[in-house]
Regions:
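ATP-dependent carboxylate-amine ligase
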Residues: 1-163, 382-392, 396-406, 410-544
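Active-site phosphate/ATP/adenylate-binding loop shared across adenylate-forming ligases
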Residues: 75-106, 203-237
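A short, basic/flexible loop-to-alpha-helix module at the beginning of a structural domain
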Residues: 168-179, 409, 511-514
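Short catalytic-loop micro-motif centered on adjacent basic/acidic residues
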Residues: 187, 214-216, 240-244, 301-303, ...
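Buried hydrophobic packing segments
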Residues: 201, 205, 226-230, 377-387, ...
Length: 544
């Protein structure tokens, strides 16, 4: 018999299961920064496909089809009740284990959560006050299946109003920026190295100009964050503004450049990062060069001349650029305006000489991990020289920077093992550089990383190259997502080391595998590369 108590139980189970689904999709949209192309690109990944093709969704469709033929209302009710009771049980277990996927509760997320919760509640109450029949059951399942689409539809609908708010914010920031006639703005963009270059430059310029220097906060590089920095933090005491500029599509860097009006533009490097959202490598090149193309004739462009994609694009458009002064920085070509040579790389520092075209030459020391930071230092040095600093001042300021300031840092795990935490984000250039750095350790070398995302058609080839690099430099590679695991493995096969590449996504299992690998050796190194579940990171941080 179906009684009111059982109907209330079903209502309770159904409502909480929808709240769980709501939390997940809000998390996913927030993770992808409410960017439709990034959101859709996620569903081409292994984990993204699992969101669609899984046992729970299969059972929902099966139950929906079953209802078309079954006229036994009591049986149908208990099937639906059992189904949602089990789903609620899984939700409560995840809640108890603190494994529940949820967004970071910002004002925007709180608004969306309350809106969608009201929507779910209203729909549930509407249904549950109707007659209990097969239409009732079918509507329950249909709403459940369609909820992700409803969430996405309304988020995109609200994004229209958000975009109007952003345009207004940019206009206000642009107007305020115009009031600061003597403000020197330095724009920094690139596929990689933006944040570290910004932090290095801020440290160097602050050593000379003190509180007159302002920068965008850590990892804030979208138009909204930059506009808010201008509106909320910029004041008449500031003489230099350093803005990190990021983008997932063409036109965004141009939009920010029109707002901040940079005099100096620094291009850190170009690679295939976000190829899926830009559409092509050429679009990435065009998008990143929007900063350089925005510079007026009296401006200064500072380029990473080690980067082939920058060279290629520059050669195509150099005659069309308005900016006249272009500074080339290189660790490879001695003819560059700012050049680095005589490298000595240790586990946690880099020593090298910096030479300029006018034959200034000074020793530099960076207490950072990996030779790839040298080019960042050259870009910073080139900029600081233009602002009246000398190489000795720049070298002294850079020597005071700690690895944690750049997001890639080294920690002691135990007496025999160290860990490199490089878990903010990963790109092809950074992964290769970090893997190459591991050769400085004599013991076991282990990398734990997910497959890289948003690389479009280049993804397979890039992951094969990563596999080769792991095989050359590591004793074990643990890949925690399945998307291009086989490509990584096939890359390692080139060196006959495909058995050294394994897949594991369970944090406890990963830790157990790593500990068994390093227990008999000294001078071991573990590299945690790229964004990964906090549970994995926290397990390795316990001993740190």
């Amino acid at each position: 018999m179906i009684n009111n108590f059982l109907i209330c139980v079903l209502f309770f189970c159904y409502f909480l299961v929808q709240i769980k689904n709501l939390l997940f999709y809000l998390y996913l949209w927030q993770l992808k920064e409410y960017h439709l192309k990034r959101f859709l690109a996620h569903f081409s990944t292994y984990n993204g496909k699992k969101i669609i093709f899984n046992l729970t969704n299969l059972l929902k469709i099966f139950l929906l089809c079953f209802l078309l033929f079954s006229q036994k209302i009591n049986l149908n009710f208990y099937l639906i009740l059992s189904f949602y009771f089990i789903l609620l049980g899984n939700f409560l277990i995840s809640l108890f284990k603190k494994n529940i996927v949820k967004p970071k509760f910002t004002l925007k997320i709180i608004f969306l959560f309350l809106f969608f919760t009201s929507l779910v509640l209203a729909f549930s109450k509407f249904l549950f006050f109707k007659e209990i029949n097969n239409y009732f059951f079918a509507n329950l399942l249909l709403f459940d299946i369609l909820l992700p689409f409803l969430i996405s539809f309304f988020i995109l609908f609200f994004q229209f109003f958000v975009s109007l708010y952003i345009k207004l914010l940019i206009l206000k920031a642009k107007k305020k920026r115009e009031e600061f006639k003597n403000l020197l703005v330095i724009g920094i963009t690139g596929s990689y190295g933006k944040t570290s270059t910004k932090e290095l430059l801020f440290t160097v310029l602050s050593s000379k100009f003190g509180e007159k220097v302002i920068k965008t906060r850590e990892h804030i590089n979208a138009e909204v964050g930059i506009a808010k920095t201008i509106l909320e933090n910029l004041n008449q005491n500031h003489k230099i503004f350093i803005a990190e500029i990021g983008a997932y599509e063409r036109g965004k860097i141009k939009e920010v450049s029109e707002m901040i009006k940079p005099k100096i533009g620094i291009l850190t490097g170009i690679c295939q990062q976000h190829l899926a959202t830009f559409g092509s490598l050429e679009n990435i090149q065009k998008g990143k060069f929007e900063l350089i193309e925005s510079l007026e004739a009296q401006g200064i462009a500072i380029l990473n001349w080690d980067n082939d994609f920058i060279k290629e694009r520059f050669e195509r458009i150099k005659d069309k650029l308005r900016v006249k002064k272009i500074i080339f920085c290189s660790t490879k070509e001695e003819r560059a305006d700012v050049f680095a040579k005589d490298f000595f790389v240790s586990k946690n520092s880099i020593l090298f000489k910096v030479k300029t075209k006018d034959n200034q030459e000074v020793d530099f020391k960076l207490n950072l991990i990996g030779i790839d930071y040298a080019i960042n230092a050259l870009l910073v040095a080139a900029c600081a020289l233009e602002l009246g600093m000398n190489l000795n001042e720049i070298s002294l300021a850079l020597s005071k920077i700690k690895d944690k300031d750049t997001g890639c840092y080294l920690e002691k795990y135990n007496e025999n093992t160290q860990i490199i935490f490089a878990t903010y984000s990963a790109n092809p250039f950074g992964v290769m550089a970090h893997l190459n750095h591991l050769k400085l350790w004599q013991g076991k070398k282990i990398v734990i990383m997910p497959c890289l995302i948003e690389l479009g058609k280049e993804a397979k080839e890039i992951h094969q190259k990563i596999g080769k690099e792991i095989a050359k430099n590591c004793d074990l590679g643990i890949i925690i997502t399945k998307d291009y695991y086989q490509e990584v493995k096939s890359g390692a096969k080139t060196f006959g080391k495909e058995d050294k590449i394994i897949f594991s996504s369970r944090s406890e299992e990963i830790l157990k595998t790593v500990l068994s690998e390093i227990e008999k050796d000294k001078d071991n190194i573990i590299l945690l590369e790229g964004r990964m579940p906090e549970k994995i990171i926290s397990l390795f941080k316990k001993n740190v």
